[in-house]
Amino acid sequence: MSESLRIIFAGTPDFAARHLDALLSSGHNVVGVFTQPDRPAGRGKKLMPSPVKVLAEEKGLPVFQPVSLRPQENQQLVADLQADVMVVVAYGLILPKAVLEMPRLGCINVHGSLLPRWRGAAPIQRSLWAGDAETGVTIMQMDVGLDTGDMLYKLSCPITAEDTSGTLYDKLAELGPQGLITTLKQLADGTAKPEVQDETLVTYAEKLSKEEARIDWSLSAAQLERCIRAFNPWPMSWLEIEGQPVKVWKASVIDTATNAAPGTILEANKQGIQVATGDGILNLLSLQPAGKKAMSAQDLLNSRREWFVPGNRLV
């Protein structure tokens, strides 16, 4: 194989842990792992380690959990490891310029989109919501900007009509490690060919919010159906009925024109709950009332038919 590189890995969630696992199987030398501090989780708010920390400790790797990499003493932790390259995957902390320049080959990042499209925090969800035909991963050389560095390697995959953010996440978690290992080989061999991003093609993937996931019936049925898939499994699209939030897990588009005001319930039967939108009809198929499990529209109608009387409007 190519030269074995001394690698610092920086990442936090499961998506990152899958990349670390691939690195550990690749023959490279992971000399240290940076991940975010343990966070309170669950009902008991017990401090929980990140998936990356769990894997790193299982493999006996040195783990560092600074709150920030701005203090000089924390930057020294990076310098002391004398790495050839730092691999960053969904780490969640900003790397100052001094840290970016410490490894011999700099720092590289695995980003969940085909840059320069969808720079930012939520590329998977934004690509789905926008109706993109494909997405993928980009391995890039990091600089001080937000996902602005030169691109080293790309892998793409189609977005299907059934994909959710959850299924795309899994697809990219398979693609990312493949691209990462190939990029590291090219860096070690000196065959990498950095490509400058075309600034005229840039779009931004802003962070998601729960309020943004509230269904806006003035949008088209096609947009709302994509939104429901984009926000699954988090934060989940939702609507409000009698002051209660009801999550929507699945819906379909009925390509029929209607003059009814957006949000008007047109039909409620075993085929679903059909609601007028700004353009077309959205058929709600799977919903989850507060405190309940997700259920089919038919099961919800059996217990809450009064919520979905044809002619009433959802707001």
UniProtKB/Swiss-Prot annotation:
This chain belongs to the protein called Methionyl-tRNA formyltransferase
- What cystine linkages occur within this chain? none
This entry's Enzyme Commission designation comes to: 2.1.2.9
One Gene Ontology cellular component term attached to this UniProt record is: cytosol
**SUPFAM superfamilies xrefs:** FMT C-terminal domain-like, Formyltransferase
Q: Which family does it belong to?
A: Belongs to the Fmt family.
Reaction(s) catalysed by this chain's protein: L-methionyl-tRNA(fMet) + (6R)-10-formyltetrahydrofolate = N-formyl-L-methionyl-tRNA(fMet) + (6S)-5,6,7,8-tetrahydrofolate + H(+)
Which Gene3D superfamilies has this protein been placed in? Formyl transferase, C-terminal domain (3.10.25.10), Formyl transferase, N-terminal domain (3.40.50.170)
- Which gene codes for it? fmt
Q: From which domain of life does this come?
A: Bacteria
Q: What class does this enzyme belong to in the EC scheme?
A: transferase
Q: What does this protein do?
A: Attaches a formyl group to the free amino group of methionyl-tRNA(fMet). The formyl group appears to play a dual role in the initiator identity of N-formylmethionyl-tRNA by promoting its recognition by IF2 and preventing the misappropriation of this tRNA by the elongation apparatus.
Binding-site residues for (6S)-5,6,7,8-tetrahydrofolate, renumbered to this chain: 113-116
Q: Which GO terms describe its molecular function?
A: methionyl-tRNA formyltransferase activity
Keywords on record:
Protein biosynthesis, Transferase
